[in-house]
UniProtKB/Swiss-Prot annotation:
Residue span of region Disordered: 143-183
Biological process according to GO: response to gibberellin
Start-end of Low complexity biased regions: 161-175
InterPro entries in UniProt: LOB, LOBD
Protein name: LOB domain-containing protein 40
Organism: Arabidopsis thaliana
Amino acid sequence: MRMSCNGCRVLRKGCSENCSIRPCLQWIKSAESQANATVFLAKFYGRAGLMNLLNTGPDHLRPAIFRSLLYEACGRIVNPIYGSVGLLWSGNWHLCQAAVEAVMRGSPVTPIACDAAVTGQAPPFNNKLCDIRHVSSRDENVKRRSRGACKEERNVRSLSHESSLSHESPVSSEETTTEEPKTWIGLELTLGLEPLARGNHVVVPMKKRKLERCGTSEDEDTCKIELGLVCSE
């Protein structure tokens, strides 16, 4: 049965043949120091964050990644402003090395005073030559060009719309001023057995249509409907 490595044991996780932590601890001689370093990094970066950072590199680079994370975390605790890079630049790398040794022993790390961290010699990150914030990215240039093109297109559309409205306005006024000639046509529609004489131009309204019933003894059940439609100018 394969035993778990010291890193997986303190993290209380299963250790397999493809363990990411086991090769990272080979440069540390003591088992207690391996456990202390793993617990310290798990508290600083988080358990999931530590595993993700270790798994980003290939297998032969994972020990170097583990050591780099350890020195960076210790340097950040000693100098919260500039970290391990600031300690290296200011000539105080021995403070970072002492912090790493304290972590191996399980002792607390003592940070430097805030005044000393602020007034100390800072790395040249504030130099304009090293600052890349003034360099505009290609995506920003594309966005600016697209915004300018959209504004020009909107202006052209608004101008064309206004010109079309100005051309349409006199036509609409002419159409409103024209009046159709008022002509009245009277139609007379007749429906019956007997034709209506052309000389009679009487228009029978709809409400006054006559329903006449013949009173002869021969056709008692017959009805006569007269509907008149006369055309008159």
